[in-house]
A protein has these predicted regions:
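K/E-rich alpha-helical interaction surfaces of small helical-bundle regulatory domains
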Residues: 37-51, 152-161
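Central antiparallel beta-sheet cores of small beta-barrel/beta-sandwich binding domains
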Residues: 40, 48-128
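Edge beta-strand at a domain terminus
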Residues: 145-169
């Protein structure tokens, strides 16, 4: 009689293990959905000429210039937003300038955003913007007027230990 009871308990063991494994896979799936690709972080823009901090703002993503390779102009003064079409804003420092706003996730794509705008302080122009993350360390941004065909794509590289050695600073 005791042997039979042990046999029944041993038969249950594979079912328990299967149940635990299934729960673990389910949790992994949920975690992967919650930890979807994100543009949040520090990025080298324009080949390392600027560092932009991308952060969540409401239900969107925004980006602010937090560093420049050459923060001073020819006159030795801090670079200003002197190309801005609004003359009242031309005295703003480039460092600290909000250059990326309004990026919202595209419904089906976990690593793409649209509906945003990107400001180019070098020209004073603001463009419509879409973004796509490739892997975890490359962010492609396309700024355009009207239709995406009439635009330019730039690649930002996430700042990290390996990039610090490979980007000329």
């Amino acid at each position: 009689m005791k042997i039979l009871v042990l046999a029944l308990r041993c038969d249950r063991l594979p079912l328990r293990a299967l149940f635990i494994a299934a729960c673990g896979m389910g949790l992994t799936f949920i975690a992967s959905k919650t930890l979807a690709a994100s543009p949040v972080g520090l990025w080298y823009a324009e080949g390392g000429a600027a560092e932009v901090q991308v952060f969540p703002c409401a239900d969107e993503f925004c980006g602010r210039v937090v560093g420049l390779r050459s923060p001073l102009g020819e006159d030795g003064c801090e670079l200003r937003d002197d190309k801005n079409p609004d003359s009242a804003l031309r005295n703003r420092a480039i460092i600290g300038l909000l250059v990326l706003t309004g990026l919202k996730p595209i419904d089906d794509d976990q690593a793409a955003w649209s509906g945003g705008s990107i400001y180019d302080p070098a020209s004073g122009h603001t463009y419509s913007c879409i973004a796509r993350l490739e892997g975890n360390d490359r962010l492609f941004l396309r700024g355009y007027f009207g239709i995406q065909l009439l635009g330019r794509t730039t690649t930002w590289t996430r700042v990290g230990a390996t990039q610090c050695q490979s980007v000329n600073r």
